[in-house]
Amino acid sequence: MKKDSVIIVSGGMDSVTLLYEHKDEIALGISFDYGSNHNAKEIPLARMHCERLGIEHITIPLEFMGRYFKSSLLEGAEAIPEGHYEDENMKSTVVPFRNGIMLAIAAGIAESRGLRHVMMANHGGDHAIY
C-alpha cells in the first residue's frame, strides 16, 4: 500500500487509534502545540507512536491560539469542567475553529509533499459544540 497520507495526531486515544488503523498509508504524523493543557502529555505520546510505527512526526507550534483564543482547554484559563461530558461542559472546552486551522495547515503540508490524503480523528462527543 502506498504511503500517501498525513495524519493529525494529538496523542489522544482517537487519533492514535486512527494512526494504528492506517499505519501502512501514513507518511507523516503532525501534532500541533497550541497551548492546550494536554499538549505536554499528549504530544510526546504522538511522537512515540509514530516512531514505533516508523512514521515521520513533526510538531508545529501555534502559540497564537493560546494568546488570542478563549477556552478552558488552554493553559492559564479557567479550570476544565469536571463530571459527565455534557453539552454545557463541552462548550467551555472549545478552542474556536481549532480543527479547521489544523486541517488547513495539514492540507498545505500534504500538498507541498505530494501526499493525497489528510486524516483527522475528531471526538464524536464534540457534536454539540459545532
Model-inferred region functions:
Residues 1-130:
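ATP-dependent adenylation/nucleotidyltransferase module used to activate substrates
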